[in-house]
Amino acid sequence: PDYSVKRGEKTIYDVTIKHLLTMQAPYKGKGDPWTKVCTSQDWTKASLDFLGGRKGLTNQFDYRTVCLHILTGLLCQATKMTTVDFANSYLFEPIGVSRHHNYHAETAAEHKQFTIGKEPKEPVWFCDPLGVGTAGYGLCLSASDMAKIGELCLNQGRHKGKQIVSAEWIAEMSTPTQPALIQFQQMHYGYLWWILDPKQNVYSAIGNSGNVIYVDSKNKLVIAVTAYFKPTVLDRVDFVETYVKPFVMAGKG
């Protein structure tokens, strides 16, 4: 409500939350505007400045990371809570995930060290100066905590008999929203989750550096992988399906 749309910008009025969730939102320019967003005091407004453009809605897949901050900005606006407080109250604590805290880097060097440093991370969620958590990266989870989130998805949003996330949402987020993406190893995309096999309901959260939550609904299997920073990791799913999954399935048999 407190954002002023740039003069002449019309496309932004047609953009929905679903466009952001499915990476089909239109943006001005190519690539993520890391510097302009991350050096601003309000990352949500800075990201909104890049939303829209003259081409209008094309429904083309355009993977962005930093501009997803719009989603957490909307969440904070709607709930009147910080991202991490909302997650702790309604997701993490109910399923036994470690309680997380906000972390904000004061300098560019500190931000870089947080991203690429190999020292163990505390349970934190990277945030902007206003305390709004990043949506596309920066959530530090252990493999155990990642597996708990995967198990929640596997169980259609239920944990120990309690519905934490609606089964309808789990089904919708893991349903392809567009044809297989040639440039992304023929994977499909749902709501911020990669769909690996729509027929067998196999899907995955693939994060920064190749961190993965892999969910195989047919085989009732969840695999979580954590990793140090490495840019453009493309083989993590192959690693899981070629080495980890067969090993686990052999043990189950």
Predicted features by range, described:
Residues 1-62:
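Active-site-proximal loop and beta-strand segments within enzyme catalytic domains
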Residues 29-32, 76-88, 157-165, 234:
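Structural helix-adjacent loops and short alpha-helical linkers that scaffold large soluble proteins
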Residues 20, 61-92, 145-153, 220-223:
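Alpha-helical scaffold elements that line and support the substrate/ligand-binding pocket
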Residues 93, 102-111, 121-174, 178:
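Flexible, glycine-rich surface segments
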Residues 202-253:
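Structured C-terminal helix/loop/strand segments within mature extracytoplasmic catalytic/sensor domains
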Residues 1-25, 78-136:
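Active-site helix/loop module of the DD-peptidase/beta-lactamase fold
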Residues 50-57, 67-69, 127-135:
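Flexible glycine/proline-enriched surface loops and loop-helix/loop-strand junctions
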Residues 112-133, 172-223:
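Active-site Gly/Thr loop motif
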